[in-house]
Amino acid sequence: MKGSKYFVFPTQPDFLGTYKKVKFQLREIEAKIQPDLVYSITAPSYFKFHAPEVMRFTNPWVTHPNKFAWSILSLKEKIQYFLYSLNQKRMMKAAHYFITQTETCAKGICRITGEPSDHVKVVHNVLPAIFKSIDNTPIIEDDQINIACVGAATTHKNFDIIPNLIQELDNLGVKNIRIHVTIPFENSMIKTINANLKAMNLSDRIVNHGHLSQEELARMYCRCQFCFLPTLLEVFSASTVEAMYFQLPIVATYFDFNSEVLGASCLYYEPKNAKAAAQQFQKLVADKQLQEVLKGRMLK
């Protein structure tokens, strides 16, 4: 659109379709504007620029993958991710300045590119503004223990552990729980989770809300008392700051990307170990003083 201050292009990379056309248009725009720098909000952008490029890079599969995340992939997926990461690293080296969300990711960027740490700026994730306008007073409607488990329905979130967690809690005598998730109803992940819980005769222990607006999500948080973060790979999960804002004591996987954000305000467990996670929840549910200590640490 001529005369506009912004341009909308087809999603890239689209090597078999619009890529060459978009590449040519970007070169024309850069030549006309002659920018002092280019800021790639989602990087790498698959294009080269004459101006210095600042990349906003937030892909943990490239900067800090781990054995637990790799273990959930099929052989085909492992090959795909390996080749994908090689290409991402190649393109990252075209830039000399980066923005990311955590020190964990920043260290990975420096290791890959060889850039000094002062070339990588960490800008942390923040709480959605709408949450600050919503009353976060807890809502207690019954004697159920409600646990929020929020995130996109991606494999590395490790929501597949939920049935085993519920079974382990049941074995420990913690039966009055409900885990609240926000997985799209048509997604195969929730269908698998529900099937596993049905086989265990524990279907009543989970509530799937599907896609929620931020206001609806806030109301869900208000009705929960705890938060579960089973993720195996992150840069900075929004669920961490959301849970802290709503004062939900957290049980999370023990990784640098979690401990960097949550510090001592959380109980950690060995990744993929449902029994260990259940033991931490049992400890948390039984100890009101511990709950208050963790809540207090969230405010620091």
Predicted regions located by residue number:
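Nucleotide-activated donor-binding/catalytic signature segment of Leloir-type glycosyltransferases, i.e.
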Residues: 4, 191-215
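Short hydrophobic beta-strand element within catalytic cores of glycosyltransferases
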Residues: 249-252
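Aromatic "clamp/platform" in nucleotide-sugar-dependent glycosyltransferases that forms part
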Residues: 232
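Glycosyltransferase donor-sugar binding loop
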Residues: 177-194, 210
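Membrane-proximal helix-turn-helix segments that form the acceptor-binding/catalytic region
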Residues: 77-98
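Short alpha-helical donor nucleotide-sugar binding micro-motif in glycosyltransferases
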Residues: 26, 30, 211-212, 219-224
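Conserved acidic donor-binding segment of nucleotide-sugar-dependent glycosyltransferases
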Residues: 267-274, 283-288
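Conserved donor-binding/catalytic core segment of Leloir-type glycosyltransferases
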Residues: 139-157, 163-166, 180
